[in-house]
Amino acid sequence: MEAQSHSSTTTEKKKVENSIVKCSTRTDVSEKAVASSTTSNEDESPGQTYHRERRNAITMQPQNVQGLSKVSEEPSTSSDERASLIKKEIHGSLPHVAEPSVPYRGTVFAMDPRNGYMEPHYHPPHLFPAFHPPVPIDARHHEGRYHYDPSPIPPLHMTSALSSSPTYPDLPFIRISPHRNPAAASESPFSPPHPYINPYMDYIRSLHSSPSLSMISATRGLSPTDAPHAGVSPAEYYHQMALLTGQRSPYADIIPSAATAGTGAIHMEYLHAMDSTRFPSPRLSARPSRKRTLSISPLSDHSFDLQTMIRTSPNSLVTILNNSRSSSSASGSYGHLSASAISPALSFTYSSAPVSLHMHQQILSRQQSLGSAFGHSPPLIHPAPTFPTQRPIPGIPTVLNPVQVSSGPSESSQNKPTSESAVSSTGDPMHNKRSKIKPDEDLPSPGARGQQEQPEGTTLVKEEGDKDESKQEPEVIYETNCHWEGCAREFDTQEQLVHHINNDHIHGEKKEFVCRWLDCSREQKPFKAQYMLVVHMRRHTGEKPHKCTFEGCTKAYSRLENLKTHLRSHTGEKPYVCEHEGCNKAFSNASDRAKHQNRTHSNEKPYVCKIPGCTKRYTDPSSLRKHVKTVHGPEAHVTKKQRGDIHPRPPPPRDSGSHSQSRSPGRPTQGALGEQQDLSNTTSKREECLQVKTVKAEKPMTSQPSPGGQSSCSSQQSPISNYSNSGLELPLTDGGSIGDLSAIDETPIMDSTISTATTALALQARRNPAGTKWMEHVKLERLKQVNGMFPRLNPILPPKAPAVSPLIGNGTQSNNTCSLGGPMTLLPGRSDLSGVDVTMLNMLNRRDSSASTISSAYLSSRRSSGISPCFSSRRSSEASQAEGRPQNVSVADSYDPISTDASRRSSEASQSDGLPSLLSLTPAQQYRLKAKYAAATGGPPPTPLPNMERMSLKTRLALLGDALEPGVALPPVHAPRRCSDGGAHGYGRRHLQPHDAPGHGVRRASDPVRTGSEGLALPRVPRFSSLSSCNPPAMATSAEKRSLVLQNYTRPEGGQSRNFHSSPCPPSITENVTLESLTMDADANLNDEDFLPDDVVQYLNSQNQAGYEQHFPSTLPDDSKVPHGPGDFDAPGLPDSHAGQQFHALEQPCPEGSKTDLPIQWNEVSSGSADLSSSKLKCGPRPAVPQTRAFGFCNGMVVHPQNPLRSGPAGGYQTLGENSNPYGGPEHLMLHNSPGSGTSGNAFHEQPCKAPQYGNCLNRQPVAPGALDGACGAGIQASKLKSTPMQGSGGQLNFGLPVAPNESAGSMVNGMQNQDPVGQGYLAHQLLGDSMQHPGAGRPGQQMLGQISATSHINIYQGPESCLPGAHGMGSQPSSLAVVRGYQPCASFGGSRRQAMPRDSLALQSGQLSDTSQTCRVNGIKMEMKGQPHPLCSNLQNYSGQFYDQTVGFSQQDTKAGSFSISDASCLLQGTSAKNSELLSPGANQVTSTVDSLDSHDLEGVQIDFDAIIDDGDHSSLMSGALSPSIIQNLSYSSSRLTTPRASLPFPALSMSTTNMAIGDMSSLLTSLAEESKFLAVMQ
């Protein structure tokens, strides 16, 4: 070896001398030396053997001497004597040690690195300089060139043993001034054998701790004062550093000699200790868990002057790069060189041992650069965490290929796994790779492609707007003629053409960014931004404005990212490290890494040629592109068509890290062309396929294998990350508004904080089996990994589930669409969506990020809130008010400050998008989802809901997914809905919520409570006067109403006629027709459970069940007693049939024991469980709050039961009606004011709420159990009631309609319609709907849809404030959502669009409660929905004063059929009596996790009505904080924070007993907290 090394040394010496001497001046020499290492100066001295990039220096260094012979390895100029001396000392360990006299590389000249002169012209600095002056910088530095001494450190010739020793490669060697005695190189200048114990170490320490010390200068030898020792020139200093192992320098003891290296017996413990304890410098630690590898590209370096570097590029990288992470390990570097310990110019030509030294140098440069960036890089050696048995560094070839040895900048060096490639640009290769899993790894994970362009031009050119434009640079084109459509101008130069196009065509058509170039493959598909078009045009003109600024390099690129990739060839940066365990190879671009990984570590060929008939598959995207280009023609490459417009391809199969190996077999086929898969492209979103990228495109998180793979905060790779694409891919229509989300090049769509799992899922917009499979596959894989991390999703989507129909720009829904957010609409049919889908969609809902809720891929960031493991996003509030979120937010979540599922500002859910997000899902639903998910994935079962033991069997079964009514889950998606339609549930139109009313803007829960505005409120009517005095405008016939409702004609802006329930936008004619027919045909069965917050459902169920069953039978008059005929009850102008129904309940005597009095703790409320026992609810005195809510919500429309029962713990509540008639009195049932009804007949008796009216008296009116029952029971056949106008003013609603499930006539709806063609349009049937079926869940025969068992007249108070709190909810129907669930049933009365009416009520409402005269459609949902019982849930959801569209909650069936059995009605909620009855919201002290009563159906059928969501705006912004504002509003007049529903309706004051709402109740909070903890545990 020695002989060889000597010979090589001689040869190299000659070569080096030649190369250096070629320069005319010393300065040139120094410059050239520098340039040779830093910039390739092939142009000036093509003959030089080493043109290399900073890191390529390593690549240039062959492993063996023979290889070196070709490389100019500067022999040490030191005399052989010296070398021999050293050899003796080190026992021959360093055969080629250069003489100390020429400290640097043994070039013939010992040049001073500072001035290029042969002799150091600066006096050596003091032995221990107080500080190192800054590195002198001259213009050349600004020019991007460093001028290092060409005669730097002599090559560190180490024995092969040393080279193979893992210690070297693993140790980041740090140069420290040896302070050696110049006279005796062999002797340690310090007497102590272990200098680290000595002042010297103190000095070192000072270096570490002293930022003032310019480590950059120290590392580079740039600073004249850096010479560490008086007798030592900087060159010597570095030389000695290099020789530390051989000399008795302070580190001689630490650094293993050849012998020790050979044995590998080096004790690094000391170093470790030193490293970790003494030198807390910022250098990279061995810890593999750092952030992802950051490109150390100078471009990414904040200290790098891009503008100077890219002098010629019109589009300087500065703006981009300055903003890029400056934390790259090279952050301290001046230019493309990181402030590495040894200047690249000092490139060592190493002999056989060089590999280790290379590693050493690179490590130094990497780590030190890291430290030096801070101005104080630890000079100490950084021990490798472990030293494997001696073995060559894995990534480094033992011998360099000639190509590699040859000119450095050659890009081949990049592509080849050169020795240097082993070293990642940042950090130890070993650690680097492990610690920084770049999502952009080889596979084109979204961020990756952008960076990893192939230097050649094959680099992926990610077209911001379209992946079509593969990243590869276009063929050399020099177009001078304009081929723009209609333009044939010719120019002399390309520049002129470009100018013409930009000014005349692009800027001239500012409104539309379309390429009209003839034969453009984009086919005039518009770009989302002008800059995209500008970049795109370069494909046609051949313009390549981005030129490489390194001297001698003539490369130019049309895309900046390609230039950046290319620059890596000069800088040697290789940010893409092989993710295979034990492989340290690093690559400058992801494609090369992909190639390496797929070829070396697997046989996978994920990149499949998409050209029809071609079956070629490749290991990397660049090969695929090359194939496509050469075989199929330049135009064939990666076009969207290839990618398959049919449905977005799943992200390239390649997933980072270990996943890369684990890719599912199916993935490869799915892998798109590298380019296509270019998911890695930051902007790689195709126009059509919106990829919501969750991570910074530029540099995906290290930890996350793929951008979507892991949240930045998670060190684990997200299970979903396998799909690098990680993001939603939603097909957008051409101009899809959402496409913009990720359209911007280099603009990460989502924060790295995105949930780990979140990103990976991509919904396949197009319904495509492949997509579905992909989704299934992804989910399965992810689920396996993620069990417990987030709510369990069904791993396998229903066949169509993943399909998201193309997003429609305007947001209209085609087919069955769920509007996802903004303009996008998901079109999956009801059958398509499964709980999983819903969950996913909900999660999509999560974040408001860029343009729509869609932005978060599929789960909200887990970071979002400590307690909301999966849902809320950090920016929870943004979304929260964003879209018309009337929907199903689980009240509990919304207002439970500690809700388990949501953070207090439960991300959007709080105000809730219409999507039934998990937040929206009731606890039961969530529970069920989890259970299903666990079952599917084999994970542990979810934590049982707190009240499970109390739940009815049915509820339990439902939770377990054995729902009795599997079909009754979500409204059929196919039920047509227009944006104009309100009502998430069943897609019925939603009631206007106060905030929906004109003039009501979005309002945060924190905003002061606003009472319903006049506009929303029904026209004021004297409270105590009879209804007839109100003289509301006559209602249109039911048919008319229906049509009007559909058309929203019923909702004139002004006055009384405003139909609050109608959706804000008038439906189109076609919509009317279609909706009408579809709604009538809709067969989805909805349970209240589906929409009402779990808590509410539970509460309602419990109420209904107990009260209903207990009292209903007893209190309900026999059918004979109760008028079944439509004529039985007339509720003149009864705004809400609902009221009537509920009134019954009010009237029903409530058992003394009922909890009606119980204050609804806010927690309870939040849980959705006012813990009234079902019986209590059923009991007459229904908690006013809920009832009131139900009733009172109607803005000012208070339906006061004429005779609210005072019986029961009425004391606490005000009886809704002053006169309480037994439930049985049909007359009371009759809402009509007829004097006979026991209250002043027509007068709207505002049953004086005993409690102060909160606008709406929240007075908890005792609700007659029967009434409640009725309400629930009346799952109203409201469907039939549907648009039946209640008899208008004076018209008496006949609630008595028997609710025979199938009785159309009997159905309240029909009856209502029939009876009161003109009726107020108040859906008496709403009342009915709620109460109609009160006859008992089990008693279909008794179901009286419209039948309000209670005879009490419900006085509908039109005064906006008069909404009886209980009137609605309290109303006679125990099971009425209004009463039970919908605390807001009244809401339906109220103008608020979202009425919390029971779904049944909804039916009623939709029947048309016009505020005044107009039919107020609850949610505008046609109650017609096929006899699906609408769970009251949706209505109830509106606890807070928010009215939900959900009022529409009627099961469409219910409403339509109106025939659903009472049991259905009763159960409407979630099988109200059965499922949820036991799910009472936990008692005051019990908090039901919102997840608690997740109804399996609810999830399953959950259709997310995106339109509604969008439409509604922030209807239901439940208080993000705690209780649903509505509920609380009146609970605590003063506590607006809790009660500030956006649409805060006045609530009747609660009686003290109820007002005891434990809004601040600690026990409730604690309970809630405990539940949350449980929930989180489950989630995790």
Curated annotation (Swiss-Prot):
Residues 461-474, 632-648, 684-699 have a biased composition (Basic and acidic residues). InterPro entries: GLI-like, Znf-C2H2_ZIC1-5/GLI1-3-like, Znf_C2H2_sf, Znf_C2H2_type. The modification Phosphoserine is found at residues 664, 849, 865, 877, 907, 980, 1006. One of its GO terms (molecular function) is DNA-binding transcription factor activity, RNA polymerase II-specific. Phosphorylated on multiple sites by protein kinase A (PKA) and phosphorylation by PKA primes further phosphorylation by CK1 and GSK3. Phosphorylated by DYRK2 (in vitro). Phosphorylation is essential for its proteolytic processing. Transcriptional repressor GLI3R, a C-terminally truncated form, is generated from the full-length GLI3 protein (GLI3FL/GLI3-190) through proteolytic processing. This process requires PKA-primed phosphorylation of GLI3, ubiquitination of GLI3 and the presence of BTRC. GLI3FL is complexed with SUFU in the cytoplasm and is maintained in a neutral state. Without the Hh signal, the SUFU-GLI3 complex is recruited to cilia, leading to the efficient processing of GLI3FL into GLI3R. PROSITE patterns: ZINC_FINGER_C2H2_1, ZINC_FINGER_C2H2_2. There is a cross-link at residues 438, 462, 779 (Glycyl lysine isopeptide (Lys-Gly) (interchain with G-Cter in SUMO2)). The full-length GLI3 form (GLI3FL) interacts with SUFU and this interaction regulates the formation of either repressor or activator forms of GLI3. Its association with SUFU is regulated by Hh signaling and dissociation of the SUFU-GLI3 interaction requires the presence of the ciliary motor KIF3A. Interacts with KIF7. The activator form of GLI3 (GLI3A) but not the repressor form (GLI3R) can interact with TRPS1. The phosphorylated form interacts with BTRC. Interacts with ZIC1. Interacts with ZIC3 (via C2H2-type domains 3, 4 and 5); the interaction enhances its transcriptional activity. This is Transcriptional activator GLI3. The gene is GLI3.
